[in-house]
Amino acid sequence: NKKIVIEWGFFALVEFLVSESKNIQNKYKNALDIGSSHGNHTKIMRHFGLKVDQIDKYEKHAEINNDFNSYNFKKKYDVIFCSHVIEHQRNIGFFLDKIFDTLTDFGVLVISGPKHPAERFVEGHIQSTIMPIFLQNLIFAGFDCKNAKILSMAGIENSFIVKKSKTFNL
């Protein structure tokens, strides 16, 4: 199926893939799509030449049909893409620490979450991804946010493209 569906996190993913397109073949060989759902983002990453594994505990067609937080990965990934999964996490610190540990030393995280006020209740969203909270959680997990790309779509989502910090220290 050649059809590409634009979903949450699409613009951050395309920003990363287009800006890094010359490096994908030699710098970024594999990727993990957390909460991959129907695989639309996976198709886009594969189109750019990445070898992508999908993990989704609700989607039986994912290569890894399991919960990201409890799955024991046998390898590390150069790129991790995570779109609109973080707001559903009971422990955002554990989730981001697991992502950090699953990335290679020079790995990149492309992550997006909904942009709505923290006081607005959205069923199933138990974490806020408003910009200052999202940013602080990424910093505390060890990501280099000084050199991050930040995309904020009015009223829709906040996204970060970040690398692991080489000098992280709290």
Language-model-detected regions and their locations in the chain:
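Conserved N-terminal segment of class I S-adenosyl-L-methionine
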Residues: 1-75, 79-81, 94-96, 127-133, ...
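A generic alpha-to-beta junction signature in SAM-dependent methyltransferases
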Residues: 25, 103-105
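A short acidic, helix-capping loop that chelates divalent metal ions and anchors anionic groups
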Residues: 62, 117-122
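Short catalytic micro-motifs in class I SAM-dependent methyltransferases
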Residues: 83-88
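A short, conserved alpha-helix within the catalytic core of class I
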Residues: 89-99
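Short "lid" loop at the C-terminus of a central beta-strand within the Rossmann-like core
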Residues: 114-119, 152
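Short secondary-structure junctions
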Residues: 144-148
